[in-house]
Amino acid sequence: MNKSIIISVILLLPFLFAQSQTKIIDMHIHSYTQSDFGGREPARDHYGNRGSANAAAHLLATFAAFKKWNIVKAVVSGNPESVENWMAKDSSNRVIKGILMFSPDDYGMDTVRFEQMIKDKKIEVFGEVAPYYGGTTLSDSIWQPYLRICEKYDIPVAVHTGGGDPGGTYTWSPKARLRLADPYLIEDVLVRYPKLRIYLMHAGGEDWPEHAIRLMSYYPQLYTDVAVML
């Protein structure tokens, strides 16, 4: 019996070693300050699991997960202050700096400040951009000045697709409409900016994964992440 166990362990060693060495790039992480922590997400998830108690605990738990699962890079988006806080704690140079925006004027943003933040390397990915929650789409005119800047500096764009949290329209995102989260609604952007790299967050969500796949097969500059697909 013991001999069989030893042989089994020996046979599994190469597999276990390979798994432990797998390097992961997480394309979809959110940062918070205490002022916006818990403003959108419920205290417990669908399965009853409780989240972090506050923004500081969330940061520590996420960095522990980075280490545990060998996440070597992570695209982190949130308000600019929160991303800076995460950078200050990032001794392993894991964080790729993003910015979470529902509307083009969030945080008092304008194109002058946005371009300067890119020049200062405070924004390395434009996203998560989530027009859906603000009642717009990435193809709307209000987003075009930002997209032109991103194409100019080769800044990837991460755009929300698929729906949001159940009941969100009745609470924190009254302008959100499910139809606005269809990946097909960004096709005009893909045509207008052929050099602009974009990835579809949530891969079209639970409603439009086929639309995401079809777009990616047609437009070579389009990618996806696979975060929270259901």
For the regions a protein language model found, what residue spans apply to each?
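Bacterial N-terminal signal peptides that target proteins for export
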Residues: M1-I7
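Hydrophobic h-region of N-terminal signal peptides that target proteins for export
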Residues: I10-A18
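An N-terminally biased module of ancient metal coordination in phosphate/nucleic-acid-related enzymes
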Residues: S20-N79
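Hydrophobic faces of well-ordered beta-strands that scaffold small-molecule active sites
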Residues: I25-I29, A74-V76, V95-L100, V125-E128, ...
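Catalytic metal-binding/acid-base residues of hydrolase active sites
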Residues: H28-Y32, N79-P80, A130-Y132, G162, ...
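Alpha-helical scaffolding within the catalytic cores
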Residues: H58-T62, N79-M87, Y107-F114, D182-E187, ...
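Active-site gating/metal-coordination segments in enzymes
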Residues: E81-G168, R177
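Catalytic pocket-lining loop regions of alpha/beta-barrel enzymes
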Residues: E124-V125, S139-L230
